Amino acid sequence: PEKQIYTCFSCGASGNVFTFVADFEKISFTEAVRLLGEKVGINIGTNISVSNKKDEYFDIYSTANKFYQNSLFTNLGKNAIEYLDKRHIDKDTIKKFGIGLSIQKVSLTEYLINKKYSIDKLVDVGLTNENGHDIFINRIMFPIYDLSGNPVAFSGRIYNTKDTAKYVNTKETDKFKKGKILYNYHIAKEYLKKNDSVIIMEGQMDVIRASTVGIDNCIATMGTALTREHKSIIRNMANNVVLCFDGDAAGEKATISAIELLEDTGVNIKIVRLPDNLDPDEYILKNGKDSFLAQINNASNLIDYKMEILKKNKDFGNIKDISSYVNSALKELINEKDNIIVELNLKKLSDNFNIDYETIKDKYNKLIKNKKEVVRDIKPKKTYNKYGMAENYLIYYMLKNEKVLNMVDGNEKRVIGVL
């Protein structure tokens, strides 16, 4: 207790209060600092700078969220409820995900102004336009939460017309950046404490649909490609990642991009390829829970998926295409660490294309040798010990913050306490 650290003698994990919360809650170190700050009444920004002023942003979005939810269950919300019912979204699911409704006849802007929020602030946070009117009108509202479970944005979907954009999202703000948000993270992380596998999808309706059949370890990228910020979050969430994007060409492109980003994280990646260009929402509606779970349980491992992708646009009646495919496959296999998987795939290449096994193995060994020689030529990166890193961080904050610079007066403990 005196040292403010912990050690688990069972699994060997150790660290301080921040690393403990990060590991337990499956969140990044930065989010752990911010979460603990909120617990003790300190507002920690995304750059870990401390502010004593209460941020109105979360209050506004929390108030707006309740307003939209209440609007859905009024007489003016009957058509929206019927629409959701036809989409097999029941009231329990509506409440679980905080789904609401924006209504033209009932102004959110006026409601929030009566709550003493300024019009400038409402424009700034993306709920009101420059003319003082609501951004969202006659749309089913899906709140978007940050990693700590605070509502920070909305996605509004049309339900009674086809003459406008299907979805409208809150503009990006300091608190809402798509590249840092994973839809349903705040709910999914609770299920991941028991299930060490997260399913990544593209859209919020995919996640909601999965939840309606009891599959709650799903998150979504809000329709964007995975980012480096997402990568850091996902790495801490689970040891097993299932990519289940849409079954069309765009979904396949997103899958390949996600693999390239996550491949060096050490997580076990599996891939689901849904048939008939269906997305998870459509697939579950059409085929049901058991069929979808079968897709998840039979997901391809990383090397099998890559081998299938390499076959695209290849004519295996053409010798050059066969040679091109085999060489590309071998280049993928040299990165595989499991020798059994390597041997099985080498044998499969030999059998499928009637090529002598020793010829395949010889080519593989040459590629391995060349790879080792290239690695040998690369100079090792300069590394820093913990004291060097601490010094670098101190210099960084001295340059960034004049208050820190002024505090460097020989009292190192005081400075470290601030950082």
Which residues are covered by each model-predicted region?
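Non-catalytic accessory segments of DNA primases and related replication-initiation nucleases
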Residues: 1-120, 124
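Acidic, metal-coordinating catalytic cores used for nucleic-acid/nucleotide bond scission
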Residues: 205, 226, 245-255, 273, ...
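Phosphate-handling DNA/RNA-contact segment within nucleic-acid enzymes
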Residues: 103-237, 241, 254-255
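Non-catalytic protein-protein interaction segments used by genome-maintenance enzymes to assemble
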Residues: 366-419
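Terminal amphipathic helices with adjacent charged low-complexity linkers/tails
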Residues: 101, 342, 347-375
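C-terminal or mid-to-C-terminal helical accessory/interaction module adjacent to the motor/catalytic core
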Residues: 267-355
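Structured, non-catalytic alpha/beta "coupling" segments that mediate domain-domain communication
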Residues: 23-32, 37, 139-158, 281-286, ...
